[in-house]
Amino acid sequence: MAEKETPLTAVKVEALVVMKIIKHCSQTFPTTATGSIVGMDVGGTLEITNSFPFPVLEVPSESHFENAPTNPAAAAPRAKGNAAYQAEMIRMLREVNVDANNVGWYTSANMGNFVNMNVVENQFFYQKEMNERTVALVHDVSRSSQGSLSLRAFRLSPKFMTAFKENKFTSEELQKSNLRYQDIFVELPVEIHNSHLITSFIHQLQTPNIPTPTELPPSLAALESGPFVNSTILAPNYDNLTLSIDPFLEKNCDLLLDSMETHHTETNNFQYYQRSLAREQQRISAWQQKRKQENATRATLKQPLLPEDEWQRLFKLPQEPSRLDSMLNSRQVDQYARQVDSFVSATTGKMFAVKGNLLPGETTK
């Protein structure tokens, strides 16, 4: 193992591990899938060489268990029942001479909605109880279905770990520590590694040759549907002119609006707390002023003074709500905004191209 003073700079995942994670997450989609990852730390690079899924304890609908999680799979990494299972799996891997160091866990996501309390609590449990140098791999099944693999590695920042351990998420504490929603996670670059034999085999694969048409097309319809479409680079392709908005982009916009509404609700709750606190402080100030006047009168009459700290028993200041939920929601809004920004470029160009047909008064009769 590398020295703890060497910071983690990257995550290297074996291709077989990536395939196992993709298969597990795709089979359980749209429900959450979680599992453990093992490997070793080499010079600040976390090499992940194997993985295995966590068993999920399904709670019957008619059960009356207290504190039963609403999503057992999401809470599986920190479940007590999985600790023995994970230790037994690592022991078996060690017996067959496989890297058996616990380096983190993985989870599935849908449309980038991985910024939640379950992920934070799981990663906090791993960095605090298991090993400080652990990561969480997040595989977005919906994003990967668009054609590009979405596999990201995250860790909780030391600043957020300290605040979460002390459960200090009040406005005063956040200002003192300068903790922002951008400081919740630290993302590490992910590299997918193949063995030399697999890399050599991939380079030896030959691309099948496309037969070249020998006869000219008799009509335009034959040109659009014949072999010229696949062989000619400049063949007409009208699919690029379609105005249908990507459903992934449309769903992201809906989720972004929902997160913004949640942020608005959290802001209203905090403003209500501030108004309630201001009212109580005014009442306390008025009571203290009245008590001082009474004590001044009693002092002139040489009577015993009344206690001036009695307001602590008579008045109760409202408790400030935790700002953790608001921070997580802000980080989720940022995640949705980044996804929309990455997908909006192609659609925006098409919308500007037909601007005259979309806006009234822009077309000429």
From Swiss-Prot:
Cellular compartment(s): Cytoplasm
Cellular component GO terms, alphabetical: eukaryotic 43S preinitiation complex; eukaryotic 48S preinitiation complex; eukaryotic translation initiation factor 3 complex
All copies of domain MPN, residue ranges: 11-160
GO molecular function: metallopeptidase activity; translation initiation factor activity
An annotated GO BP: formation of cytoplasmic translation initiation complex
Primary location class: cytoplasm
Keywords, sorted A to Z: Cytoplasm, Initiation factor, Protein biosynthesis
Segments forming a coiled coil: none
One Pfam family this sequence matches: eIF3h_C
The keyword Cytoplasm is assigned to this record: yes
Family: Belongs to the eIF-3 subunit H family.
Self-association state and partner proteins as the record states: Component of the eukaryotic translation initiation factor 3 (eIF-3) complex.
Protein's job: Component of the eukaryotic translation initiation factor 3 (eIF-3) complex, which is involved in protein synthesis of a specialized repertoire of mRNAs and, together with other initiation factors, stimulates binding of mRNA and methionyl-tRNAi to the 40S ribosome. The eIF-3 complex specifically targets and initiates translation of a subset of mRNAs involved in cell proliferation.
HAMAP family in alphabetical order: eIF3h
The protein's name: Eukaryotic translation initiation factor 3 subunit H
Source organism: Aspergillus clavatus (strain ATCC 1007 / CBS 513.65 / DSM 816 / NCTC 3887 / NRRL 1 / QM 1276 / 107)
